[in-house]
Every structure is written in structure tokens, then in C-alpha cells.
Design a protein with these regions (language model features):
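Positively charged n-region of N-terminal signal peptides that target proteins for export
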Residues: 1-4, 140-141
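Sec-dependent N-terminal signal peptides
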Residues: 4-14
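Subset of outer-membrane beta-barrel
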Residues: 19-348
Length: 348
């Protein structure tokens, strides 16, 4: 089974070479809106019991998510509001379960001025993405593949841009094993219309993930390695630059190991199957890029909790970006399936 999963990984790697590197538009697509995922470091790919997870890995769409709806909201940095709504529903046929999601970002109101700096009014900016996906089990295997299509709309004042993107995912899941493995390729697509006639790339990303639940320990571990399509993601931190007696400035030198670690996100969930659970995560890249010299800011750390009451789940996450920048994310999930009297075991 794992051999099949390996060949799927090879196929995804070949497809990824067709994507063009460089700056990108619609970067909000790579911002987590889910409170549970945010608490686990900001990016997980292996949550099988969360109706928001298919937004990041469509292979996790499964029949146990039927009639579950979730809403998340966060008052992000600089007064930006970001949120999402997800829903899954079962149908008959080879593609049994479909998943839908709406993600929005409201950047707020800005002062509009002419070339001389004279204020002429105000304008707004916002983003929205609509997604629909499904999954399929490869016959006689424990491998599941999924895909979703996204329509994207972005507006700044009187200018707007639209785009179309695809996500592909694969997951190895065996109910008798304590581990899962995932591979995703996200935001494969193009702009349908541009802001100023110049086409830009979408924020294409390749990532792998894993989870592990020890047999006698109620602590599930999560690991995500992101941005595999681009090895060097290092950005020198201005607070780590040095200046000599002549006033010459030297940027921070980032080592091979330092750059490698910036691809890693780790998380842990205590009592993952209980009514109350606690989560913590660490994003290495965020911690390094927002680090202050000689000051412990705890940037990159996130934590939160989940509370389940019958068919309602409440989630909260606290993300530490900087000593002056922290974000709280709230989530509410409701199981609308009246025939389900208890939480079913995770299965497809």
C-alpha cells in the first residue's frame, strides 16, 4: 500500500515542475482560517474528523463528515477580518461525499489620495474563494485521493481580479495503524481576469504531512513540511543584521539547516478523541522571520483547545506572531445529522 502512495508522490512531483515560480497573487489562499488547524501550528494535512480540513487536503473528504457545518472567524493582524464556512454532504455514486467551502478576507477601509497626496475619499479591499471538492478510494488499498476546484475573486477599490485553481491531495489511512501520511498540491491554476492587464502566478504549493497516535498515550502528533516546490524560502531578519564601526550593514546569514527547518510545522493534540482536548503547535518559519534580537518573543508558537458538547464543537486558537502581534481564532462546528447519536470512528 505504501508503495502505491510513493508512486502517487512521484506523479505529484512531476506535475509540480510545470508550475512557474515567482511572485504570486491571491496569497490569502495559504492563510489558515480554521481554529483547530491554527492551534496546531497553522497548517495540518491529516485531520480526518474535521470538516474544515478538506480545504487544505481534499483527500480527507469522507462520509463521516456528512451534514457537518463549520464556521471560523479571526480578527487578523492590522484590523483584517478573515473567516470561512465549510459543509460536507453524502450522495450516492462513486464520489460519495462532496465538500464545499467559502473563505473571505476583509482588509477594511483605506484612505484614497491623488498623486499629490490629497485625500479624495476612501476605498475597500477584499478577497473571497469558493471551493467544491470530493475524494475517491483507490480500489484494494488504503490510499485515498481527492480534488477540489476553487473560484477566486479579489477587489481593490474599483479594480478586481478573478482566478480558477485546483487542489490535489492523497492520504494513506489504515484504521488499524496509528499513523497517516499525506501529500498535497494546492492552487494549481491561473487568473481569469487581471487587475491591470498583467497576469500573475497563483500561490502554488506542495506539502507533505504525517500524524501519529501512540498506542498508550492520548497525544496525537502532527508534522507538516511545506513549500517543497521551492527549497530556499529564507528571508533575512532585519533585527539580526549587524553594523560595523564604519556603518556598513551585514545581513543575517541563513544556514542550510536553518532554511530546512523553516519548512517544518509541528503540532500536538492532547486527548484528541475526548470531549475536551488541548492543542499546541510551532511554526519554525514564522518564529525565525519575526524574531527580535536579544528578546524572547515566542513568535511562531500557537495553542488552543476544543470543546465538544453533543453535536456542537467549539474551537479556539491563539497565535503568537510577534511581541506586539497576536491573533485569536474562533470556530464553531455543528453536526446536522439527526440519525447520528454518537461520534463515529474515523473511516471513509
Amino acid at each position: 500500500m505504501l508503495k502505491q502512495f510513493f508512486f502517487i508522490c512521484i506523479f505529484f512531483a512531476l506535475v509540480s515542475h510545470a508550475q512557474v515560480a515567482g511572485t504570486s497573487i491571491f496569497s490569502f489562499l495559504n492563510t489558515s482560517t480554521n481554529a483547530r488547524q491554527t492551534a496546531l501550528g497553522g497548517k495540518t494535512l491529516n485531520l480526518l474528523d474535521d470538516v474544515d480540513q478538506p480545504t487544505w487536503n481534499p483527500a480527507t473528504i469522507n462520509s463521516n463528515l456528512n451534514k457537518q457545518i463549520s464556521a471560523n472567524y479571526s480578527s487578523f493582524l492590522a484590523g483584517i477580518s478573515i473567516g470561512s464556512v465549510s459543509y460536507a454532504h453524502n450522495f450516492s455514486g462513486i464520489f460519495k461525499t462532496f465538500h464545499s467551502n467559502i473563505t473571505y478576507v476583509n482588509y477594511g477601509e483605506f484612505i484614497q489620495a491623488d498623486v499629490d497626496g490629497n485625500e479624495t475619499g476612501t476605498f475597500n479591499a477584499s478577497d473571497i474563494a469558493l471551493a467544491l471538492g470530493t475524494s475517491y478510494q483507490i480500489p484494494n488499498s488504503h490510499i485515498y485521493i481527492g480534488t477540489s476546484v476553487k473560484f477566486i475573486y479579489s477587489s481593490i477599490a474599483n479594480f478586481s481580479s478573478t482566478g480558477l485553481a485546483l487542489d490535489f491531495g492523497a492520504i494513506y489511512y489504515n484504521a488499524l495503524k496509528p499513523y497517516t501520511f499525506s501529500l498535497v498540491m494546492r492552487n494549481i491554476g491561473t487568473q481569469l481576469s487581471t487587475f491591470n492587464g498583467e497576469s500573475e502566478n497563483l500561490p502554488f504549493e506542495v506539502a507533505i504531512g504525517a500524524s501519529y497516535l501512540p498506542e498508550n498515550l492520548p497525544l496525537r502528533w502532527y508534522l507538516t513540511v511545506d513549500n517543497l516546490q521551492q527549497w530556499d524560502i529564507s528571508v533575512p531578519n532585519p533585527s539580526n543584521q549587524t553594523t560595523d564601526l564604519d556603518g556598513n550593514t551585514t545581513e543575517e546569514e541563513i544556514s542550510f539547516i536553518d532554511n530546512a527547518l523553516r519548512h517544518f510545522i509541528i503540532g500536538a493534540e492532547l486527548f484528541p478523541k475526548r470531549a475536551v482536548n488541548v492543542r499546541i503547535g510551532y511554526n519554525f518559519r514564522r518564529g525565525k522571520e519575526l524574531q527580535l534580537q536579544n528578546v524572547r518573543t515566542f513568535g511562531g508558537i500557537s495553542f488552543g483547545f476544543g470543546l465538544r458538547m453533543n453535536k456542537i464543537k467549539l474551537n479556539y486558537a491563539y497565535s503568537r506572531f510577534h511581541s506586539a502581534s497576536n491573533v485569536s481564532t474562533f470556530g464553531l462546528s455543528i453536526d446536522l445529522n439527526k440519525n447520528r447519536t454518537e461520534i463515529a470512528p474515523t473511516k471513509y
